[in-house]
Amino acid sequence: MTVRIAINGFGRIGRNVVRALYESGRRAEITVVAINELADAAGMAHLLKYDTSHGRFAWEVRHEREQLFVGDDVIRILHERTLADLPWRELGVDVVLDCTGVYGNREHGEAHIAAGAKKVLFSHPGSNDLDATVVFGVNQNQLRAEHRIVSNASCTTNCIIPVIKLLDDAYGIESGTVTTIHSAMNDQQVIDAYHSDLRRTRAASQSIIPVDTKLAAGITRIFPQFNDRFEAIAVRVPTINVTAIDLSVTVKKTVKASEVNQLLQKAAQGAFHGIVDYTESPLVSIDFNHDPHSAIVDGTQTRVSGAHLIKTLVWCDNEWGFANRMLDTTLAMAAVGFRLDASASTKL
């Protein structure tokens, strides 16, 4: 069965989802039938074709009126502001990928369902009343047909959760701290300008800027046993893509850095292949641009202090890796089937 998807919001993640779909050769599994975006069709086509981070799209892209052509495929373009008025029923949409970054609670998800979609996947952390939050590679096997409104968590949650799971399963994590070193985002300023967050009033290209993060909450959403045992901070740096995460955990068992690296490398080659990668090459952030993994462990930076404190550095392409996980989770949601008569009876 080919899953019919619609994309709501054609920004960084929405466009990368389309690019990843075509570049990964999954068009036999997923078809994009519509994109809802307030911008005009000419701008949508141009930004899909030309991308500063990811280069020129290999597929032919053009638009005619309210249709976007990617190769021989035709995608309907919509400019609807009201979710309930979207024509998902008419278009036979199976899953809406809501990539706006604006919507994320159950009411928003139910609006997509009322418009005719069978399921909804948010490209960002959602409210607690959603049916499930999925980090693909860790908990997607717990999805059920009744999970209709789902969050794909965040790019940083997808990056760090697999590594936390591996370390916890092997050594038993007592507590941890996380520092996210994140590329600049579109909620920052090109030059100094007003923003409700005074730090984000400053030019993104000229400073390392501390910002708030809910990553600790994202960790406990997936692993409730770590409630009040993880803290996180984040800074934005003057690059346009790729993120590094500094993870420090205190563990119950004694361990050596070489053992940690052996564990993570084995996982990258085995159970977490395609989700986690491992490198000991002397690489920098640009080298991970367009990498489809959720997490790339930099084994050269692993440290152990006092036999119980582990520090690791984990990279991710916060756009491309996450866009690929959106596709993975979409297929996982479709694989368990569609239950149309009721909302979820059990939460994940």
From Swiss-Prot:
<dbReference type="InterPro" id="IPR020831">
    <property type="entry name" value="GlycerAld/Erythrose_P_DH"/>
</dbReference>
<dbReference type="GO" id="GO:0050661">
    <property type="term" value="F:NADP binding"/>
</dbReference>
<dbReference type="Pfam" id="PF00044">
    <property type="entry name" value="Gp_dh_N"/>
</dbReference>
<dbReference type="Pfam" id="PF02800">
    <property type="entry name" value="Gp_dh_C"/>
</dbReference>
<feature type="binding site">
    <location>
        <begin position="213"/>
        <end position="214"/>
    </location>
    <ligand>
        <name>substrate</name>
    </ligand>
</feature>
<dbReference type="GO" id="GO:0008615">
    <property type="term" value="P:pyridoxine biosynthetic process"/>
</dbReference>
<comment type="function">
    <text>Catalyzes the NAD-dependent conversion of D-erythrose 4-phosphate to 4-phosphoerythronate.</text>
</comment>
<feature type="binding site">
    <location>
        <position position="81"/>
    </location>
    <ligand>
        <name>NAD(+)</name>
    </ligand>
</feature>
<comment type="similarity">
    <text>Belongs to the glyceraldehyde-3-phosphate dehydrogenase family. Epd subfamily.</text>
</comment>
<feature type="binding site">
    <location>
        <position position="318"/>
    </location>
    <ligand>
        <name>NAD(+)</name>
    </ligand>
</feature>
<keyword id="KW-0664">Pyridoxine biosynthesis</keyword>
<protein>
    <recommendedName>
        <fullName>D-erythrose-4-phosphate dehydrogenase</fullName>
        <ecNumber>1.2.1.72</ecNumber>
    </recommendedName>
</protein>
<comment type="pathway">
    <text>Cofactor biosynthesis; pyridoxine 5'-phosphate biosynthesis; pyridoxine 5'-phosphate from D-erythrose 4-phosphate: step 1/5.</text>
</comment>
<keyword id="KW-0520">NAD</keyword>
<feature type="binding site">
    <location>
        <begin position="154"/>
        <end position="156"/>
    </location>
    <ligand>
        <name>substrate</name>
    </ligand>
</feature>
<keyword id="KW-0963">Cytoplasm</keyword>
<dbReference type="GO" id="GO:0048001">
    <property type="term" value="F:erythrose-4-phosphate dehydrogenase activity"/>
</dbReference>
<dbReference type="GO" id="GO:0051287">
    <property type="term" value="F:NAD binding"/>
</dbReference>
<comment type="subunit">
    <text>Homotetramer.</text>
</comment>
<dbReference type="InterPro" id="IPR036291">
    <property type="entry name" value="NAD(P)-bd_dom_sf"/>
</dbReference>
<feature type="binding site">
    <location>
        <begin position="12"/>
        <end position="13"/>
    </location>
    <ligand>
        <name>NAD(+)</name>
    </ligand>
</feature>
<dbReference type="GO" id="GO:0005737">
    <property type="term" value="C:cytoplasm"/>
</dbReference>
<feature type="active site" description="Nucleophile">
    <location>
        <position position="155"/>
    </location>
</feature>
<feature type="binding site">
    <location>
        <position position="200"/>
    </location>
    <ligand>
        <name>substrate</name>
    </ligand>
</feature>
<dbReference type="InterPro" id="IPR020830">
    <property type="entry name" value="GlycerAld_3-P_DH_AS"/>
</dbReference>
<dbReference type="InterPro" id="IPR020829">
    <property type="entry name" value="GlycerAld_3-P_DH_cat"/>
</dbReference>
<dbReference type="InterPro" id="IPR020828">
    <property type="entry name" value="GlycerAld_3-P_DH_NAD(P)-bd"/>
</dbReference>
<keyword id="KW-0560">Oxidoreductase</keyword>
<dbReference type="InterPro" id="IPR006422">
    <property type="entry name" value="E4P_DH_bac"/>
</dbReference>
<dbReference type="InterPro" id="IPR006424">
    <property type="entry name" value="Glyceraldehyde-3-P_DH_1"/>
</dbReference>
<dbReference type="GO" id="GO:0006006">
    <property type="term" value="P:glucose metabolic process"/>
</dbReference>
<dbReference type="GO" id="GO:0042823">
    <property type="term" value="P:pyridoxal phosphate biosynthetic process"/>
</dbReference>
<feature type="binding site">
    <location>
        <position position="236"/>
    </location>
    <ligand>
        <name>substrate</name>
    </ligand>
</feature>
<feature type="site" description="Activates thiol group during catalysis">
    <location>
        <position position="182"/>
    </location>
</feature>
